[in-house]
């Protein structure tokens, strides 16, 4: 597992949990406002943290820490993510996953295997402005919509969040995000 950061204690990253946060490298988006740009653009240039170091710390903190947040970059791009999450689960920690939602198949598999307990998914912009906000010339927006549907029917707690950026987001943009969300959620509910 490619780990490029480890915050040993956080009160912010996993709602209602004292948690540790693991940062993965790499991302399939190029958001111009990314707050972890170095993990996205140059993961190999960032210090590495071994999986063993993380797991050893988590084992020592059992009974003190209440969960683990896995973030990035984009964790769902990591080929060893599933195995890593299984090892955390063996330590009996609940896991929160932060994701951009562009890998719905991975999200589905992790949910089916009960490897994640909470998901925070970014909604970058309205449907029409998504590619620009994600820093991609072209993208398949249906993958975002599929992930929203997967989370809605997952039975686990989740949140959708938007990083507000001047020049990308306006009041009108947020109204469009709201309209799109309502339409999509109504379609998913069969209404």
What are these regions (language model features)?
Residues 37-68:
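Conserved alpha-helical substructure of the radical SAM core
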């Amino acid at each position: 597992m490619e780990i490029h950061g480890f915050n040993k204690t956080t009160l912010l990253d996993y709602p209602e949990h004292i948690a540790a946060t693991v940062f993965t490298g790499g991302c399939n988006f190029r958001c111009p406002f990314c707050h972890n740009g170095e993990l996205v653009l140059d993961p190999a240039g960032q210090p590495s943290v071994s999986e063993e170091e993380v797991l050893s710390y988590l084992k020592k903190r059992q009974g003190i820490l209440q969960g683990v947040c896995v973030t990035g970059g984009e964790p769902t791009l990591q080929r060893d993510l599933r195995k890593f999450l299984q090892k955390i689960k063996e330590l009996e920690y609940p896991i929160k996953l932060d994701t951009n939602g562009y890998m719905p198949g991975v999200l589905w598999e992790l949910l089916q295997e009960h490897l994640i307990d909470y998901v925070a998914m970014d909604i970058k912009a309205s449907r029409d402005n998504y590619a620009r906000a994600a820093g991609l010339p072209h993208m398949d927006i249906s993958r975002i919509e599929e992930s929203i549907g997967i989370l809605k029917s997952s039975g686990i707690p989740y949140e959708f969040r938007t990083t507000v950026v001047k020049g990308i987001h306006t009041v009108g943009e947020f109204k469009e995000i709201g309209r799109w969300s309502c339409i999509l959620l109504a379609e998913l509910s069969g209404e």
